[in-house]
Amino acid sequence: MTAKVRVIFRAAGGFEHLVETEAGVSLMEAAVLNGVDGIEAVCGGACACATCHVYVGPEWLDALKPPSETEDEMLDCVAERAPHSRLSCQIRLTDLLDGLTLELPKAQS
């Protein structure tokens, strides 16, 4: 049985969308499958569009692998990049990320 992972997506206006999904999927997949507004995912998870940009809660950064060079280059395309910006298609959920909290940008690039 695959572990369930809970993720909170917080919209710019403060609305929170709690998603419970299986470990092993990407944050982007979890958002799309659960109807989270604000994750466009135009490229379908190929790290080629930056329309799945999220802000990871600073307390979670150490639990994530650092961005790849490709992800870092794509993040240069987002309008409001921050030190805790990530592309949700590049983060695979594990049981260690249960309770992960993310902020969604006001608009995707």
From Swiss-Prot:
GO CC list: cytosol
The UniProt record lists the keyword Metal-binding: yes
GO biological process: carbazole catabolic process; P450-containing electron transport chain
Key words of the record: 2Fe-2S, Iron, Iron-sulfur, Metal-binding
Cofactor or coenzyme needed: [2Fe-2S] cluster
Cofactor info, note text: Binds 1 [2Fe-2S] cluster per subunit.
Main function: Part of the multicomponent carbazole 1,9a-dioxygenase (CARDO), that converts carbazole (CAR) into 2-aminobiphenyl-2,3-diol. Acts as a mediator in the electron transfer from fdr to CarAa.
Family membership noted in the UniProt record: Belongs to the adrenodoxin/putidaredoxin family.
PANTHER family (UniProt xref): FERREDOXIN-2, MITOCHONDRIAL (PTHR23426:SF65), FERREDOXIN/ADRENODOXIN (PTHR23426)
Name assigned to this protein: Ferredoxin CarAc
The encoding gene: carAc
